Amino acid sequence: MFVDKTLMITGGTGSFGNAVLSRFLKSDIINDIKEIRIFSRDEKKQEDMRIALSNPKLKFYIGDVRNYKSIDEAMRGVDYVFHAAALKQVPTCEFYPMEAINTNVLGAENVLSAAINNKVAKVIVLSTDKAVYPINAMGLSKALMEKLSIAKARMCSQGETVLCVTRYGNVMASRGSVIPLFINQIKQGKELTITEPSMTRFLMSLVDSVDLVLYAFEHGRQGDIFVQKSPASTIEILAKALQEIFGSKNKIRFIGTRHGEKHYESLVSSEDMAKADDLGGYYRIPMDGRDLNYAKYFVEGEKKVALLEDYTSHNTKRLNLEEVKKLLLTLDYIQEELKNA
């Protein structure tokens, strides 16, 4: 898959970068690959990763996706790009929406333009369920990032850079997510703060996130969006599962929804479900390749029209308490926290 190829991961010191590098370093992929470039703006995280992983095939580039020159120069000679750099904290983006636009939209524009300029073979862009029917600044910026990716994909001719999008649900135990928060509250003997008990979220592991990106990389065509089917849980059940795993008696306090939060998340809209391909564990949403000359399409007619439900954290498989506990115990993060409890 990556034999003698150079891969770049933007935002490579984040949760996804650590997960995909862990996968590669534990497999034969690291022997096949020529070089992996970690592109990010945090020199301390890069130094920590360099020391922890200590592999000569990892090359570190300081830069910011907001700066076209830095990403363009770092991308010279790159074959494939995983674009993970983003601002992803919903409340923060609500207070600083222009920062979300600068990183998630304009930064993505820089990454994609640099990839096309440097004749990168394929780019996988990481998105989020919050981009579907977005109500918050983070989701809106990611929705625009998706639209930007598809628009650029339409302009790429046969044999040029292939642009694909992967859309995530909630990645369990990723940086800034609720599971580390709950565990810290449990260990400190504090109340577990739950926004809204009936709120549902998809449950996706970091392993799943890597699987999704690699699946998109292997199977993606120009302009495809890929979604992995995932189970879901209410926030209350998730908190109670962690309480039981850690033997906690901490009280639960309901604090109400935060800025920009949705009651449930959607991974595929009903409009996209009408054209999505069901691939078993995944959905593929193909690019709408029509141009602006709509008249000819009205004459030819639509081949497939359907009225379908969205694919949401409310109507996917809902896990009960025991099922959530079982899922959580498969996470390396939970096992490490139990050892240190």
Swiss-Prot record:
Is the keyword Isomerase assigned to this protein?
yes
Q: Which GO terms describe its biological process?
A: lipopolysaccharide biosynthetic process
Q: What class of enzyme is it?
A: isomerase
Cited InterPro entries: CapD_C, NAD(P)-bd_dom_sf, Polysac_CapD-like, Polysaccharide_Synthase-Rel
Q: Which GO terms describe its molecular function?
A: UDP-glucose 4-epimerase activity
The keyword Calcium is annotated on this UniProt entry: no
Matching Pfam families: Polysacc_syn_2C, Polysacc_synt_2
| Catalytically driven reaction(s) | UDP-alpha-D-glucose = UDP-alpha-D-galactose
State which Enzyme Commission number(s) the record gives. 5.1.3.2
Which keywords, in A-to-Z order, does the entry hold?
Isomerase, Lipopolysaccharide biosynthesis
Which Gene3D superfamilies does the UniProt entry name for this protein? Answer: NAD(P)-binding Rossmann-like Domain (3.40.50.720)
Q: What task does this protein carry out? A: Epimerizes UDP-galactose to UDP-glucose.
The record's section on PANTHER family has:
UDP-N-ACETYLGLUCOSAMINE 4,6-DEHYDRATASE, UDP-N-ACETYLGLUCOSAMINE 4,6-DEHYDRATASE (INVERTING)
Q: What's this protein's family per the entry? A: Belongs to the polysaccharide synthase family.
Please identify the protein, giving its name as recorded.
UDP-glucose 4-epimerase
